[in-house]
Amino acid sequence: MKNTLTASEKRRFLDIIAGFRTVKILVIGDFILDQFVWGNVSRISPEAPVPVVDVKRESYMPGGSLNVANNIRSLAGSAFPCGVVGRDLYGRMLVKTMRHQGIETGGIVYDPSRPTTLKTRVIAHSQQMVRFDREKTEDVSLANLNKILKFVHQMIRTMDVVVLEDYGKGVMQPFLLREVVKLAKKFKKPVLVDPKEKHFDYYNGVTCITPNRKEAYGGYERTIGPWRKTPELEAVGWALIKKLKLESVLVTLGEDGMILFEKKGRVTKIPTAAREVYDVSGAGDTVIATIALSLAAGAKMHEAARIANMAAGIVVGKLGTATASPEELTEAVRRAGSR
């Protein structure tokens, strides 16, 4: 399939995007504070063969599952994130960035025994040079999982879609997944998962997972078993749907676009919509946020995937943890070639 739209598809997609503003999405996952250190490099250190960064400024953004929430908000939807932060300096900074970005803070669970996850990226001359991670990845306590579930119970009736964002920082555990999926099915809410490779066996019964190519193959090996010969990607997609009882699997393929497998037998190959790629960090968050919004606004899964592909094409053309706006997405639909 070429990356083109018919006139009727354009009208349909524009109607879906216009519907984002009434959508409510519950986002559960690992909260991360993203720190960006911006500077210039003009010399090598005399102490060791490493560049010296002359720091010009620093910025902070809500990351992890909060980047999904931020993408939803940027696209005019309403996000209700739930996750864990520490009672520390970075936790306070994270809450401040959430409020600054207009992200709801009612789902925060505080844990004084854990540090707030901080990812520091050093960027010079538009290039990321190094990243530092400060975190604790052990499982979140059962007491705090129950606090998350209490929030889910309070909110799920009024939500349109549930997104589970698994960064492997301790929130996503089998108990939590089972309870959330059970509640979502009770109230007929789709559940979308941005997966962690090592946790694929947790995702049984969700609506859709959105792995990248590496995660799809790693998840296949974890849930189905090792292979003697590397299987084709289509075999991986169908096997995951069958094994995990999914409605669909959307595999993101970087510069090769995406491929969607649907339980009923449909395969949709979607070429990349990106014109230029500056930074792929956060693109997966944009994809799952846009799919959630589109489904809630009445899209079919293959339509949601194509709209999400356009949104991802916008954010990879920006540096840093970026988002797309409804205006940018609307323009991308209008700009798409005709067929």
Q: Language-model segments: which ranges?
A:
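Conserved phosphate-binding/catalytic loop of the ribokinase/pfkB sugar-kinase fold
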Residues: 108-114, 121-156
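Conserved phosphate/ATP/ADP-binding segment of small-molecule kinases
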Residues: 169-267
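Substrate-binding N-lobe of the ribokinase-like
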Residues: 2-14, 46, 50-117, 332
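A short, aliphatic-rich alpha-helical micro-motif
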Residues: 20, 156-157, 200-204
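Conserved post-catalytic alpha-helical subdomain immediately downstream of the catalytic base
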Residues: 243, 247, 273-336
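Positively charged, low-complexity intrinsically disordered leader regions
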Residues: 1-42
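Structural motif
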Residues: 26-28, 131, 160-163, 192, ...
